[in-house]
Amino acid sequence: ICGSDIPRIYADGAHKMPVIPGHEFSGEVTEVGRKADERLLYKRVGVFPLIPCGRCAACRKGKYELCRDYSYLGSRRDGGFAEYAAVPAANVTVLPDSVTYEEAAMLEPMAVAVHAMRRVLPCREDRKERVAVCGLGSIGLLLVMFLKEAGYQDIYVIGNKDYQRECVKKAGVM
């Protein structure tokens, strides 16, 4: 369960109600649509929740994350808390046997962390510069792990929970 699912359920509601939340999920393909590749049937898949319109200028340039008329599993369409979810074939990736469903459910926050890294630190050659991560929720912790994996050694973290700091210590950053 993502922290943003909680207010969608108990406070603010989703973008469009009623809707079944859950945007970080994985599963098994049990049915395919007419245009989908039948080889997806019964495959284990990870799901990307953003469904771009495919028509706007951003989509035509392949910049789907900038689509203004997008749909989103778990807030604009039923998501992963449902027993079954209708997901476009373009929004799934087949999982290797070595990846669990639980790990695959982290694909969306991993993509956010990688995107942040690429936006803030594009093509940096010097891995010795200082980097700070503000916030140690799931995405912040993933960002710390990815920065360390990319060779950054001087990583500063700002978090307010003991268990988050313990995770960072286990990653060898503090």
What spans do the regions from the language model cover?
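Residue-level marker of beta-strand positions
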Residues: 1, 24, 43-44, 58, ...
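Mid-domain Rossmann-like dinucleotide-binding core that forms the NAD(H)/NADP(H) cofactor-binding site
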Residues: 99-174
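Structured surface patches comprising rigid loops and adjacent beta-strands/short helices at the edges
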Residues: 86-94
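Short Gly/Pro-enriched turn/cap motifs at secondary-structure boundaries
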Residues: 16-22, 73-77, 83
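Glycine-rich beta-strand-centered segment in the early N-terminal region that forms part
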Residues: 10-57, 96-98
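Local cysteine-cluster metal-coordination motifs and their immediate loop/turn environment
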Residues: 2-6, 51-69
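A structural motif shared across PLP-dependent enzymes of the aminotransferase-like
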Residues: 55-58, 76-86
